[in-house]
Amino acid sequence: MIEKSNNIYLSIDPIVERIKKNGEELPLINSEKKGIDYTQIVVYLVGLSDGLIHLASLAIYYLFKDHYRLTPYQVSLILMYPYLPFILKPIIALITDSISIFGMRRKPYLFLFSLFQSLNFLSLALVDLSLIQATLVLFFISLCASFCTTVAEALVVESSIGKTYSQGTNKVTEFIASKAVGSLSVAYFSGYFLEKVSREYIFMATSIFPLIISISCLFLKEKEYVTRKNIFKQMTDLIKFINTPVFIGPFLYIFVYMSGPDYDDAFFFFCTNKLGFRPSFMGTLRLTYGIASLIGIIVYRVFLKNSSLRNTLIFTTLVSFPIYISPIILTEKINKYFGISNELFVLSGGFLIEAITEIQLLPLFILTANICQEGLEASVFATILSVKNLGSLTKKGTSSLLTYLMKIDTYNFDNLSMYILTCGLFLLLSLSLVPLLPSEDQIESLKNKKIQK
C-alpha cells in the first residue's frame, strides 16, 4: 500500500491536497466518472474538430494561389494574420477563467465560438469575398478556434485534478492525439475533393465540424461559478506563476525554434507549379504528415514519457534537422541519379516541425497539469501555446522576407535549395539556448514549492 506524503506537492493527489489545504473549492466541472463522462467527450470532440477543419487547409492555399493569384512571399504574409488570435490565447484564457456567462466559464464560450466558426466557413463557401475580406474571415476562424481550444485545455487540467502524474499525462496526450486523429482523418480528402468538387463545397462541408461542438457542449454539466478575482488579479497570479526558470527557459527555446524562416509555402508552389503535383497527391502528403504526428505522440508516451525536459527538447531538435532539409535532394535532382521518383522525396518540413513541436510542448503541458494553480487552468496552458504561436507568426514574417530576398516567386525556384538549407540552420539556432533549460532539480523544486496566493 502506498502511503501519502505529508508534503502536499509529493502526494498521490497533489492538486487536490493543495486545494483542500487552502480551503478552496474543487473544480467547477466534475472529473469523476459517473456514467457517461461528457466533459471528456467534449474535450475529445474539440480536439477532433480542430483536426478535422484541416479539410479546408489545402483549399485555402489554392484559394490564395489560384483565385487571388498571390506569389509565395505574399501567401506567407497573408497567413501571418490567422496566427494573431493564437498569440492572444493568454488574454482569451484570462477572460474564460475570470468572466462567467450565466454563471458558467466553459459551456457558453464553447457554444458561441464554435457556432461563429461554422458561420465563417459558410461565408467562404457562399459569399464572393475580396482578398481583405477573405483574410478577415480566416482571422475570425482562428479566433474561434483559439477560444474553443483554450476552453478544452482548461477542461483537461480540471479533469486532471485528483489524478496521479501518469493519469494526467494520459489525459494531455489523449487530447493532443485527438487533434492528430482529426487531421489524419481528412488529410487525404483535403486534396482528393479539390479534384472532384469546388473549393466552396469543401468550405461548406468543413463548417459542419464546429457545429458538432456546439451541439455536444450543451450536454456539458458545469457548476455555477461565482467570480472571486478580477481579470487583473488573475493576470498578476499568472505572471507570478510562470515567472520561474522552469518556464522561461523553455519559452525562449520554443520561440527561437519556431520563429526562424520556413520554406513550406515556397515548397508548395514548387510542388504544384514546377513538379506538377495534383491536389490529390498533396492530400496524400498531408496524410503522411498526419501519421507522422500521431507516431510522434505515441513515441513520446512509450519512450520519452519519463525523459527529462532538457533531453526531450535536444533530442527532438537534432532528429528534426536531417528530415527538415531532405527536400534539397529533390530540388537538386539528386534522387534522379538513383532512379528514385520525386514523390518519395517530397517531405515538406513545416508539418513535421509542427508535429515535433507538439512533442516538445508535452512535458510542459504535463508539468502544468500537475502543479497548476486553481483558477488559472486555461491561462497557463494558453501562455505556453501563445509562445509557440508567436514563434509561428514570426516565422511567417521571416519566411516572407527571405523568400522575397532570394527572389523565389511563382515559377522561379533557382535559390530554393539555399533557402531550405538556411531555414535548417535557423532551426539549429535554438540549441544555443540549451543552458537556459531547467534541470530536473529545478523542476522538482517547483513541484515541492507551495504557491502563495
From Swiss-Prot:
Topology relative to the membrane: Multi-pass membrane protein
Query: CDD domains this protein is in?
Result: MFS_FBT
Would the keyword Cell membrane be found if you checked this record's keyword annotation? no
- The main place the protein resides is plastid
> What does the entry list under GO cellular component?
apicoplast; membrane
Q: Which domain of life is it from?
A: Eukaryota
UniProt KW keywords: Apicoplast, Membrane, Plastid, Transmembrane, Transmembrane helix, Transport
Look up keyword Transferase and say if it applies: no
Following inactivation of the gene, the phenotype reported is:
Gene deletion does not affect asexual proliferation and sexual development of parasites in the mammalian bloodstream and parasite progression through liver stages. Following transmission to Anopheles stephensi mosquitoes, by day 17 after the blood meal, gene deletion results in oocyst swelling and formation of unusual intracellular pulps consisting of numerous single-membrane vesicles, which ultimately fuse to form large cavities. The apicoplast and mitochondrion are highly branched and spread throughout the oocyst cytoplasm and are excluded from the intraparasitic accumulations.
Entries under Gene3D superfamilies matching the protein: MFS general substrate transporter like domains (1.20.1250.20)
Looking up InterPro entries in the UniProt record yields: BT1, MFS_trans_sf
**Localisation:** Plastid, Apicoplast; Membrane
Q: Where are the transmembrane segments?
A: 41-64, 76-96, 108-126, 132-156, 176-195, 201-220, 241-260, 280-300, 312-330, 346-366, 416-437
Q: Which family does it belong to?
A: Belongs to the major facilitator superfamily. Folate-biopterin transporter (TC 2.A.71) family.
Function recorded in the entry: Putative folate transporter. Required for sporogony of malaria parasites and host switching.
Protein name, entry field: Putative folate transporter 2
Organism of derivation: Plasmodium berghei (strain Anka)
